[in-house]
């Protein structure tokens, strides 16, 4: 049974929060592709098979096709594409793009781009009746001691990156959940355990190798194509296909961290302490945490918990003193490697139905506590109406201080705009369930929770326009919260590097700059 290993453990909090740290419906079942009307795009796959990547094109019935489809994080996001392409080089990606954007194919060959397949939004990393460009074989991790940088492929997974770098005794800013892919994480921003010290993960990128919509291979750095370089840091899939990230390396140390669980009666204390921690994060930027509430059917236990991280091997650092004073139920905190942390009780959520939805608000304990109360109402409603099967709900609140933005500005900054409008708290609300018939229960209720919490924050003048792109659901609009100047920079870069709008229209999935009205730009 899915989740059984994690939930039978006394340290269930580990598996729960790991899902909350990923840096995100409905799905057509993975059966006969004829159901999806794939005949309309058959010529797209034929043209690809006749190109230089012909031996890397796979369709329904091929083992590679099913292997790729079964590797998506959520059953809801694996769709019946007409074929998938598994490029092994930037040149292969160029061939795919030049083939699919030919004038006689462009209007009938929609395609999706997949790095790790960890998006929870249907159609963002796969496509029904189209072509999926699967970057999973571009998964290299190469350390360059002469430049103190690491080359990363977009199809890598962060746990593999960390493992491959261990012999070199270096580290990079990366994901906190082992199965998250490199590509989407970095182009969406990337919250890491080092963010209070180094900014978002994208701020540690020193160059991008990019294939443009017309197949051109270019490099973007602070000196070469600087507008593209800047806007790729938060621009998601609006600009091109990144085939290599060159990122800064720094000395690897063990870290202190783990998961501590509490009775939900501690909710007011946890909310106040999270507000205080966020307000004082500059006093010790080596410390970071997430506070969350969770319920699962296998234990039938409702609990609160913290995931705490300290980026030096210091036992019980003073930055968390307020938390030590709160009575806990269990704890796994100890000094360990980052691989140990990101794989602790690695969950097995593949083929569960999954949703992510997010909200940000100003750092205020009242809003945090109200969010925890709304989560409890959500749990009660699900219990009363669910058809059956196992399910899990998580409401995770984490600091998003201005420090995440100002620290990154030392390396050129990004277009996300965290340095604006004060310290924030980001909520990632997640639900995992088994049965298709419960889609119409879990999803609308989650959206309602977000709307209700947003209204409450607004009533206290604690609301925020910001939404973290890597946590957002498909109906949300994270790019519109970047701020007017940043939005305009991204719009200009998209028009310059993709003048035909391939990544706006021919790639239907993803958050599009073209869908952000000019009127929504805010300084």
Curated annotation (Swiss-Prot):
Pathway: Secondary metabolite biosynthesis; terpenoid biosynthesis. Signal peptide: none annotated. Its EC number is 1.-.-.-. Pfam families: FAD_binding_4. GO terms for biological process: terpenoid biosynthetic process. Transmembrane segments: none annotated. It is an enzyme of class 1 (oxidoreductase). Residues 77-252 form the FAD-binding PCMH-type domain. Gene3D superfamilies: 3.30.465.10. The gene is drtC. Keywords: FAD, Flavoprotein, Oxidoreductase. One of its GO terms (molecular function) is oxidoreductase activity. PANTHER family: BINDING OXIDOREDUCTASE, PUTATIVE (AFU_ORTHOLOGUE AFUA_1G17690)-RELATED, FAD-BINDING PCMH-TYPE DOMAIN-CONTAINING PROTEIN-RELATED. FAD-dependent monooxygenase; part of the gene cluster that mediates the biosynthesis of various drimane-type sesquiterpene esters, compounds that exhibit diverse biological activities and are widely present in eukaryotes. The pathway begins with the synthesis of the backbone drimenol by the terpene cyclase drtB using farnesyl pyrophosphate (FPP) as substrate. Belongs to the oxygen-dependent FAD-linked oxidoreductase family. Its cofactor is FAD. InterPro entries: FAD-bd_PCMH, FAD-bd_PCMH-like_sf, FAD-bd_PCMH_sub2, FAD-linked_Oxidoreductase, Oxid_FAD_bind_N. The various drimane-type sesquiterpene esters produced by the A.calidoustus drt cluster include asperiene C, asperiene A, (6-Strobilactone-B) ester of (E,E)-6-carbonyl-7-hydroxy-2,4-octadienoic acid, ustusolate A, ustusolate C, ustusolide E, ustusoic acid A, (2'E,4'E)-6-(1'-carboxyhexa-2',4',-diene)-9-hydroxy-drim-7-ene-11,12-olide, RES-1149-2, as well as the 3 newly identified compounds calidoustene A, calidoustene B and calidoustene C. This is FAD-dependent monooxygenase drtC.
């Amino acid at each position: 049974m899915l989740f059984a290993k994690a939930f039978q453990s006394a340290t269930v909090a580990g598996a729960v929060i790991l899902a909350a740290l990923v840096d995100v419906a409905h799905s057509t079942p993975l059966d006969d592709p004829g159901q999806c009307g794939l005949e309309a795009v058959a010529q797209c796959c034929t043209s690809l098979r006749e190109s230089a990547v012909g031996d890397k094109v796979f369709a329904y019935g091929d083992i590679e096709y099913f292997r790729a489809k079964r590797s998506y994080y959520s059953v809801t996001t694996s769709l019946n594409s007409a074929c998938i392409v598994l490029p092994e080089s930037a040149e292969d990606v160029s061939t795919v793009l030049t083939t699919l954007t030919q004038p006689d194919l462009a209007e009938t060959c929609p395609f999706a781009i997949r790095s790790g397949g960890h998006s929870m939004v249907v159609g963002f990393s796969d496509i029904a009746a189209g072509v999926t460009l699967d970057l999973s074989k571009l998964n290299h991790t190469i350390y360059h001691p002469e430049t103190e940088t690491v080359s990363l492929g977009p199809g890598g997974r962060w746990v593999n990156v960390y493992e491959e770098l261990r012999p070199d005794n270096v580290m990079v800013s990366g994901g906190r959940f082992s199965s998250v892919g490199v590509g989407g994480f970095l182009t969406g921003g990337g919250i890491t355990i080092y963010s209070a010290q180094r900014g978002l993960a994208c701020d540690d990128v020193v160059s991008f190798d990019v294939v443009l919509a017309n197949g051109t291979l270019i490099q973007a750095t602070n000196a070469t194509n600087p507008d593209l370089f800047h806007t790729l840091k938060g621009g998601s899939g609006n600009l091109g296909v990144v085939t290599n990230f060159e990122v800064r390396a720094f000395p690897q140390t063990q870290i202190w961290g783990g998961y501590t669980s509490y009775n939900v009666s501690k909710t007011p204390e946890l909310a106040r302490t999270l507000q205080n921690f966020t307000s004082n994060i500059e006093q010790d930027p080596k410390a970071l945490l997430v506070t969350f509430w969770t319920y699962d059917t296998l234990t039938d236990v409702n609990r609160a918990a913290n995931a705490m991280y300290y980026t030096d091997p210091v036992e019980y650092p003073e930055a968390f003193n307020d938390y030590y004073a709160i009575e806990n139920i269990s704890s796994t905190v100890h000094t360990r490697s980052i691989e140990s942390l990101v794989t602790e009780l690695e969950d097995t959520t593949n083929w569960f139905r999954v949703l992510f939805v997010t909200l940000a608000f100003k750092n205020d304990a009242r809003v945090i506590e109200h969010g925890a109360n709304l989560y409890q109402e959500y749990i009660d409603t699900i219990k009363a109406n669910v058809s059956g099967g196992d399910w899990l709900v998580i409401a995770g609140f984490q600091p998003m201080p201005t420090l995440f933005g100002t620290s990154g500005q030392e390396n050129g900054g990004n277009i996300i705009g965290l340095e604006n409008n004060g310290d924030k708290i980001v909520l990632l609300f997640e639900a995992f369930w088994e049965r298709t018939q419960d889609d119409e229960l879990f999803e609308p209720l989650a959206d309602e929770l977000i709307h209700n919490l947003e209204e409450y924050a607004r009533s206290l003048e604690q609301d925020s326009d910001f939404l973290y792109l890597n946590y957002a659901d498909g109906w949300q609009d994270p790019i519109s919260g970047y701020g007017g100047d940043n939005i305009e920079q991204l719009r200009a870069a998209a028009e310059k590097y993709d003048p035909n709008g391939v990544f706006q229209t021919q790639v239907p999935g993803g958050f599009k700059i073209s869908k952000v009205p000019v009127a929504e730009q805010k300084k």
